[in-house]
Amino acid sequence: FIGFGKTKTEYKYFLPGKEKQLQAFMNQYCTQRKRKDVMQWLPKKDKEVVKLPLTTQQKKYLTELKNSYQTEDIITQGVLDRLIRYRQICLDPGILDLKSKSPKTQWILDFIDENPNTPVIIFSNFTQYIHRLTDTFRAKNILFSAIVGEVAPKVREEYVRDFQEGKYNVLIINTMSGKEALTLDRAEAIIFTDLFPPIGAIEQAEDRFVATTEDKKDKPHVIYNLVMADSFDEDIIKLLQERKTETEVINNFRSSLERSSE
């Protein structure tokens, strides 16, 4: 190929012996650089995995779900559905109308209480959880905004602008809705309540708060990954570190189910 999807035999104006000149010309426009190559001052992200203990009720629900296809009134169909319910129980059993507090929600509340002046972005893959979290924040008079798929573009821009201008310190975002086209470099911390492939979407979400100018490079850049200890939540983190795909994570979960049934 010599450019624009054409081969030598297809390219009408190809001049024999001019391949090198053409390639040099194209290289001026096709060079891809990583941001780190262009902005060498980019700060390092400090990542912390926060392992939280499962509640007694969470343990019960997860054990039942691994040993059969249901827990309480929740009946699953297939491995993927089982994995989704498993992840939701780890995040907040209330999503499924199950009785149990959410250790992850409590950790977030404690973080905000202890760091009231820290601009923070909270990411979740589950819109149902975001709605539950917003209800909790309203009840506790915590100022925030939330960006999910149904938020109109103009409203989304308004939320971003207000956060960047410091009108509030908490912004909740659906991971897939906020993985790109958002500049939120006022934030000093990111909290991931739950993680799932693709790893590229997670990395894009992480980049939302990276300093965009050199004068902001020294601000904190801390990423907290909330994980339920002694659960498949921990396995997901490890698999993501190995850049595993969604299919590979699902297959790994299937294997864990097979082991638990032996």
What does each model-found stretch correspond to?
Residues I130-T134, R156-E157, L171-P220:
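SF2 helicase motor core recognition
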Residues P197-E203, V210-E262:
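A conserved SF2-helicase RecA2
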Residues I121-F123, H131-R132, R138-G178:
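Conserved helicase ATPase core of P-loop NTP-dependent helicases/translocases
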